Amino acid sequence: MRKTFSCIIILLASFLCFAHRATAGIFRSDIVIAGGGTSGVTAAVQAARLGASVVVVEQTTWLGGMLTAAGVGAVDGNYNMPAGLWGEFRDSLAAHYGSLEALKTGWVSNVMFEPSVGNRIFHNMVAKEKGVTLWTESEVKAVNHNGNVWTIHVARPDGHTDTVEAKVLIDATELGDIAKMCGVPYDVGMESQAATHEDIAPAQANNIVQDLTYVAILKDYGRDMTMEKPEGYNANDFACCCINDKCITPKEPNRQWPKDKMVTYGKMPGGKYMINWPIEGNDFYANMVDMTPEQRNEAVRKAKAHTMRFVYFMQHELGFNTLALADDEYPTADRLPFMPYHRESRRIHGKVRFTLNHMTDPYGQAQPLYRTNIAVGDYPVDHHHTRYTGEEQLPDLHFHPVPSFGLPLGSLLPQEVKQLVVAEKSVSVSNIANGSTRLQPVVMQIGQAAGALAAIAVKQNKGVDEVSVREVQNVLLEAGGYLMPYADVPKDSICFKPCQRIGATGILKGRGVSIDWHNKTLFRPDTVVAWNDIAGLAEVYPFAAKLLRHGEEASSVETNGPSVDGQSVGEALSVDALSVGDALSLVSAIAKQEKLMKRSAAMKVMASLAKEYDFCIDDRQRKIKRGELAVLIDGVLHPFEKKQVDVEGRFVR
């Protein structure tokens, strides 16, 4: 009997933790992820860590997508915001190469690495999660949803088709192909100003996407490696890629670099060079989104040929004849990456659409989407269009400045299709916003959020659109993620989580700045709190509005202050800035009004919090700091957990 019971437990465990074959040719899994790219791999790891079984369907043999299989071994942005699995990946790179400093080999990024190393790290991350089944050299060919279960047909490398049944499907493909397969409406190209209300959007919509790049990884062989002149070669196509005698009329005269700087731009550890050069280099225009497979293959062939012509130009015209395609990077016949670097995809019509306006003025929008953030970024709006014929008629979107920003959960959810989560670059953002949200650290966080959302939905037997926004955010925060893009409250700060949670309620708001390449949002934890700083308190606790009005109107005249349930909030409210006494009175009054605890109990909790977070509340006249107030509000009132929000960021009353 004991042996039989043990067998049952083992079988049950295999059902819960792994994709398993239900009948001949049919597998079952909690979640299927189409695409093992930059967001697909993080979605798989996060979902598995929450106990879900996952099947990842990846067309190549590599994991990591644009970071690895496309050759972009240079991470753009988020160096000071190592959120979640992006932070784990960066730490793994540092461990491999010896230090974070060892990653600073090229000037385009502070995190440079060989794509093959990144691929091994991603495979190791996935291999540690027993709930993940990885199907490489495989492709989703058809999907069907009956209202409860997805049926997914997958072409396998030996020519046969396997069928997987899953509760949730995640589209982590490079171009949003699964979303289209599921009938999700989407946009391609630039929306009009009328559609997005972005002042730098074009007046008329168009279907122009960003240039893609077929990256080349070169290494120095120490001898002449000049290739044969490629078919269709014309030196004029690349003459102004850098400062040289052939350049007469550059498209971008303000972006001309010496030839050595062009090469060291993408210098990698291991003495290799990433050739992903946007200035009349190997960027290539092809709108592959709605092409047939045959048309895509032809576009890829042309993009590869364009890159090889550029490599020949570097060898033959610029004197870099000892550089050639690395023979120890890709296991491909032509030594090129598995796929092009796509900067733009389909963008679904989601529950919400994230635009430039949400980035530049998150607190001034009709939808307070900042309350629903699941990923953060700090890269400027970066669009590549110089290889498009007629690009001079397009908006100038080259490094348009923005503060750091957060991406909302609702951008991952289609408006209509149930139990589908969309990740990678196909989330519901505007074309302009995609110039920032497309970068690798953000996309890794998108994947992690998608995995968390899917796993929670499975665990709770809910629709993905029924899962609490706050629950997803809390999982991400506990996994080392960021909800708010604060530059001045690092992840190792003792008050990181309280500031993140209170920031996500809007009780205390950040201040965005963009200076040169430094795009930040500042929480200002060590700044004293002005009364108007906490205007957001009334949005969470409407009855508190009268308390705040009294505080703003307070003078140096002694007053007993307004009362709540007959009890005075404060003996003498401070002028302009809150004192410690004001804060204690305010928080304890709200705790009583919300029936969380008596005021005396609240005072004891705040004394304990002050000790835990190492600040003093004995001097009631001292001006309280923003970080300290965040700790008190978070620890006593718990507004993040107790005041739920919908996908538009509105409080659920």
Residue ranges and their predicted role:
Residues 19-24:
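Boundary at the C-terminal end of the N-terminal hydrophobic targeting segment
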Residues 46, 52-53, 58-142, 146, ...:
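Conserved N-terminal/central alpha/beta ligand/cofactor-binding core
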Residues 40:
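N-terminal Rossmann-fold NAD(P) dinucleotide-binding loop
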Residues 155-168, 172-475:
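Flavin (FAD/FMN)-binding glycine-rich loop and adjacent Rossmann-like elements that form
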Residues 1-5:
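Positively charged n-region of N-terminal signal peptides that target proteins for export
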Residues 7-17:
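Bacterial N-terminal signal peptides
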